[in-house]
Swiss-Prot record:
Domain of life: Bacteria
An example Gene Ontology biological process: protein tetramerization
Organism: Escherichia fergusonii (strain ATCC 35469 / DSM 13698 / CCUG 18766 / IAM 14443 / JCM 21226 / LMG 7866 / NBRC 102419 / NCTC 12128 / CDC 0568-73)
Annotated family: Belongs to the SecB family.
Full protein name: Protein-export protein SecB
Cellular component terms (Gene Ontology): cytoplasm
Complex and partners: Homotetramer, a dimer of dimers. One homotetramer interacts with 1 SecA dimer.
């Protein structure tokens, strides 16, 4: 009889936490006197690291900048962290789990934190739309594949 690989995929959330919060309203209070027609910029970034065997930290950084013309109305940054137990997967599946699946779990927490900070700054309510981290991850893989192709063509 041949030996079978009985490694099952396991995924468990150990902890979700706020790692860092920053809110700045550098032009308050005079920014409150202006017409509220902001240009809102959303910036996302993820980072992951292995803490122990099958234990990973994933940090989602969400930065929102609202500007009125040349002036910054507010800048809000949240780093939402999570510790996850992940076993039984590797390679591209692990990269997808750390780069898309975990950020999908963390984003609602970061979004709620940003909404609360903006509200406490007495700015109009900010509703961030859901983010498709799976699509962002696929775009990232396509960019990496394109860069790899260009490197081989240059050689």
């Amino acid at each position: 009889m041949s030996e079978q690989n009985n490694t099952e995929m396991t995924f468990q959330i150990q902890r979700i936490y706020t790692k860092d919060i920053s809110f700045e309203a550098p032009n308050a209070p005079h920014v409150f006197q202006k017409d509220w027609q902001p240009e809102v910029k959303l910036d996302l970034d993820t980072a992951s690291s292995q803490l122990a065997d099958d234990v990973y930290e994933v940090v989602l950084r969400v930065t929102v900048t609202a500007s009125l013309g040349e002036e910054t109305a507010f800048l809000c940054e949240v780093q939402q962290g999570g510790i996850f137990s992940i076993a039984g997967i590797e390679g591209t599946q692990m990269a997808h789990c750390l780069g898309a699946y975990c950020p999908n779990i963390l984003f609602p927490y970061a979004r709620e934190c940003i909404t609360s900070l903006v509200s406490r700054g007495t700015f109009p309510q900010l509703n961030l739309a859901p983010v498709n981290f799976d699509a962002l991850f696929m775009n990232y893989l396509q960019q990496q594949a394109g860069e790899g192709t260009e490197e081989h063509q240059d050689a």
